[in-house]
């Protein structure tokens, strides 16, 4: 299965989740657009060294919204020309949030909507995150994009999780930020396996 990893915002933990997912389920990894360094692929290589990592779809030197980096660096690319690697089990990490621009005409959610694959939405706990989560879920539902689960990064907030589950009727998976010694997480692995019916290696 090919799966998109989308976020409610930038810096919510998409790459942390991607590293844990790839390490626990032997998935390959592809970053759709990389803006700036150090790269997310380098993070994956550090925490999940056995993961096959494909070259980024687009690489930008500028650590900014891709459409701005494209202009600043005078690059010529079209978002919809990015070709996804031919891999049976592939995690495709998007950049920023669902409505982060890819170029002058398209956002991340446009790409997901056109090149349909199921999606995992990643969020973390902060003031205002419930609003961002529900808006993101609604945007995916309106486009009939298959949302597999919501992953909440960081120390678990039971009250927030309960509200989101009751309101949005979506399964929630919890994953704390980790280091090299805790990336192989039994609870995370079992939660993912139960929801997605993934084969545990």
From Swiss-Prot:
Ribonucleoprotein found in the keyword field: no
HAMAP family per record: BioD
Pathway: Cofactor biosynthesis; biotin biosynthesis; biotin from 7,8-diaminononanoate: step 1/2
Pfam families: AAA_26
Keyword field: ATP-binding, Biotin biosynthesis, Cytoplasm, Ligase, Magnesium, Metal-binding, Nucleotide-binding
GO molecular function: ATP binding; dethiobiotin synthase activity; magnesium ion binding
List of residues binding Mg(2+): 15, 40, 93
CDD domains: DTBS (cd03109)
Binding residue positions for ATP: 11-16, 40, 93-96
Assigned GO CC terms: cytosol
Its biological purpose: Catalyzes a mechanistically unusual reaction, the ATP-dependent insertion of CO2 between the N7 and N8 nitrogen atoms of 7,8-diaminopelargonic acid (DAPA, also called 7,8-diammoniononanoate) to form a ureido ring.
UniProt source species: Campylobacter jejuni subsp. jejuni serotype O:2 (strain ATCC 700819 / NCTC 11168)
Enzyme class: ligase
Matching InterPro entries: DTB_synth_BioD, P-loop_NTPase
Any single biological process term in GO: biotin biosynthetic process
Active site: 31
Protein name as catalogued: ATP-dependent dethiobiotin synthetase BioD
Cofactor: Mg(2+)
Protein biosynthesis recorded as keyword: no
Subunit structure: Homodimer.
